[in-house]
Amino acid sequence: MIKGYCDDRFLKIKNIFSNQINNGYELGCSVAVEYKGKEVINLYGGYTDESKTNLWKKNTLVNVWSVTKAVTGVCIAKLISENKLDVNNKVSYYWPEYDC
């Protein structure tokens, strides 16, 4: 079962997302997209475990592996170009809990 929000303009993405879970290509997952500063997709569904006893929830935490390095790099470059991120600052400047 897929939950969340999807703007009608992006229903094709919702259908692809649903098919991935319903056809067993993904056990569980989530996707969120902002377009022109507004949330247009925030979907989640499936399970967090192979025994299918724990549903994927809106706030399910997941590890971010190597597949996201390119996207993360582009986001960081954009923040630097907008003077919203200074590479000379420590991580704890932006994320105080990291300094614990």
Set out the residue ranges of the language-model regions.
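Short, basic/aromatic recognition patches
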Residues: 2, 9-22
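Non-transmembrane alpha-helical segments in soluble domains
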Residues: 14, 18, 77, 91-92
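Alpha-helix C-terminal capping/helix-coil junction sites
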Residues: 21, 80-81
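Short amphipathic alpha-helical face segments that pack within enzyme cores
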Residues: 70-75
